[in-house]
Amino acid sequence: MEDQYVNEQGQKLLEKLKREGILPSPYNFANYKAPSLDEYIVHDSTLREGEQTPGVIFSIDDKLKIARKLDAVGVPQIEAGFPAASEKQRKCVEALVDMNLDAQLSAFARAKKEDIDVVADSGADGIVLSLSISPYHREYKFKGMSKETYLETLEEHISYAESYGLYIIYSAEDTTRENDLDFLKKAYKTAEEAGADRARVVDTLGCASPNGMAYLVKEIGKELEIPIEVHCHNDLGLALANSLASVEAGASTVSTSVNGLGERAGIAMTEEIIPALHMLYGTSIFEMNQLTSLSNLVQEISGIRMPPHKPLTGDNVNAHSSGIHQHGVLVNPTTYEFYPPRMMGQKRKIYIDELGGRHGIIYVAKELGIEISDETARKVLEKVKASFSSGERRSSYTPDEIKQLIDEIEKC
């Protein structure tokens, strides 16, 4: 049936995913064309963008812990910080360089020679050279900078960074609000000709749509030989969708942060982009079973807690509360799980509350090492439902509480 709309390339990927126990919608692979992804497919910015989250300040030791975990996941490129911002930032980047991680380290800089000098002196492999491009920034932040002056400034500073032998990522802040497409193309081409190794398209205010990002990436890509990276903010809740639309349009790298930490609503989440790239495009370079613990580590260090229903790494993502769902998933997990929980370093959870059923209670008992009859399970369920109906209870039963109910019933 699938061969009616899934082409040969899509069939191969779908079969590969099925062998891994991943059963996504086959319609994902209709007219499938594999995107051109870079060796630096994920460029994690937790240590730079993430620290711009209001109230979040990482110590040097915090950053080393996060970087070590990112490296264990297999993230190929880490944006280590903004070394020109302070002495502490500089020392942190230097300490990260001294770790000799497998990941390539980049550091952020403005289009200022003194910023570029600090990045070069830090020992970082690469530089994210930022120069805001939209008319709002050129008019108000740069006091009426003309397009001609912008291009001259850009060429001068890319060339200066290139003289240090740095891997250069030109980051055009507020790309998506520059309404002169010809000027945008000219800026990226100028950066490429001056020595940039990658072009970063930036949705600084998270105001673009997937269609808008895809169009922009395609148009800019027509002019360039160098790869494109996208940095998508989440103000409209579209950072993940915009990033994936950009990948399908030709972007080869996605800028992310763990738990989406960053300015305002943050950016695309590392722990969501990685499994999405795997389950939609077959990217297999990451240790995905480390992603839940990565998310938990950054929650602990940052103090920013994620909701339990957070996709892929939340506490409830592999939890089943409804009796209908519990029965289905216990008969065959594929009924209500399209990927195995272990893939994300998680375990299946069965919650017992007023929506639960006998099969869930039997499962919880078995997990406790107790074999119970259907009749005992039915009586436990009656007690559970009665406690919710009376208003006595408003939270799920823990396994220990279920054991206590079983003991009470079996004593009778």
Task: Describe each model-derived feature in a short phrase.
Residues 2-46, 281-412:
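A mid-to-C-terminal "edge-of-domain" accessory segment
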Residues 71-76, 98-101, 159-166, 189-197, ...:
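Generic secondary-structure signature for well-ordered alpha-helical cores
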Residues 2-113, 352, 356, 364:
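N-terminal capping/small domains of soluble enzymes
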Residues 52-77, 98, 113-226, 244-249:
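Alpha/beta enzyme core
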Residues 205-208, 212-335:
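Catalytic alpha/beta core domains of metabolic enzymes, predominantly
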Residues 85-107, 112-123, 144-149, 179-187, ...:
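Active-site loop-helix segments enriched in His/Asp/Glu that coordinate
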Residues 42-45, 76-80, 103-109, 127-129, ...:
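Hydrophobic faces of well-ordered beta-strands that scaffold small-molecule active sites
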Residues 48, 83-85, 108-112, 132-134, ...:
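Active-site beta-loop-alpha junctions enriched in small/polar residues
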